[in-house]
Design a protein with these regions (language model features):
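C-terminal beta-strand edge segments of enzyme domains
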Residues: 173-295
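Active-site catalytic loop in hydrolytic enzyme cores
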Residues: 15, 31-51, 59-141, 145-159, ...
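Short, compositionally biased leader-like segments
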Residues: 25-49, 153-183, 259
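A short linear hydrophobic-aromatic micro-motif
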Residues: 52-56, 213-214
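Short beta->alpha transition motifs characteristic of CBS
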Residues: 3-8, 74, 86-92, 216-220
């Protein structure tokens, strides 16, 4: 079981401390360690199906306190290898009661046999510099998982497709009011909106010219399919390539930090130090002198 989007953060006031703590504790218990048993199963599923998988999870910060969460997207290749993860850089409004700020070192593009894959999460896609950091690394297949579902969001997906000359998949979950209240009836006072749907989904796929080629898929669970033509990506960059001939690095520069940020730094003088490896959460003895410890 992988918990999805915590919709209740938009309904329950922050002052309802007892209820918020209970729900957060449950979400933390269900959260995913990366790598861990859950990602191992996802990797096995990708290998069995022979597909690339891009999936959102609530990630626990196991390399530090273990008590905080990130809104994270995981990418797995068809051989079952965990290529990487991206943590949402800035939680949106009420999301900050749940998720920590993501580490920018997780902002990356992965070169695969089917193209260069990467993406941003929800309202990160309104961050021009974040988008450009992907364009500048040659992204071709752009994932945009979201909880947004309105007409403006579909226009955003189309804009990204044309701006970056990429294929972009805007995937949004569908959620009925009964999906929440059937399990958490105590939340009914906070869910007084009329209608069956909390989120209608409206997932779409757009091409490098900003045309919607699949979807929108609304008020139902399902799968969108679209054919990807690599030549269409390169051909459309003939007249617009924002990280190529349409760039002006002499006028504008973007600096992206790729080194992970340590939670704490401990100075141990000349005795060497022990640090936490961010990727596998193991402790490594460093034989160094006059160094600092990064955890």
């Amino acid at each position: 079981f992988i918990p999805a989007y915590p919709d209740w953060i938009w309904h329950i006031p922050a002052g309802q401390i007892t209820l918020n703590q209970k729900l957060y504790g449950e979400l933390l218990d269900q959260a995913v360690s990366i790598p861990g048993a859950t990602t191992d199963r996802l990797c096995q599923a990708a290998r069995d199906a022979g597909v690339y998988v891009s999936i959102g999870v609530n990630e626990r910060n196991d390399n530090a306190s273990g008590g905080s969460l990130f809104n994270t997207n995981v990418l797995i290749d068809r051989e079952g290898n965990l290529l990487g993860r991206h943590q949402k850089l800035v939680p949106t409004v009420s999301e900050r009661m749940i998720w920590a700020y993501g580490d920018p070192s997780t902002l990356d593009v992965y070169d695969t046999e089917i193209g260069k894959i990467g993406g941003l999460i929800c309202h990160e896609n309104y961050m021009p510099l974040a988008r450009y950091s992907l364009y500048g690394r040659g992204i071709e297949l752009y994932t945009a998982p979201t909880y947004d579902q309105g007409g403006t969001w579909q226009s955003t997906i189309r804009h990204i497709g044309k701006e970056g000359r990429v294929y972009v998949a805007g995937c949004c979950m569908v959620l009925r009011k009964d999906d929440v209240l059937s399990r958490y009836p105590q939340m009914e006072p906070y869910y007084q909106e009329t209608g069956e749907w909390i989120n209608t989904g409206n997932s779409v796929i757009a091409d490098p010219e900003g045309h919607i080629i699949a979807g929108p898929l609304s008020m139902e669970e399902g799968i969108l399919y679209a054919d990807v033509n690599p030549e269409h990506i390169s051909n459309t960059r003939w007249n617009l390539d924002v990280a190529g001939h349409y760039a002006r690095p002499d006028a504008f520069q973007l600096k992206v930090r790729t080194a992970p940020t340590p939670v704490i730094t401990i100075d141990r003088g000349d005795s060497g130090f022990v640090s936490t490896d961010v990727e596998d959460n193991t402790f490594i003895q460093k034989d160094t002198v006059d160094e600092t410890e990064s955890v």
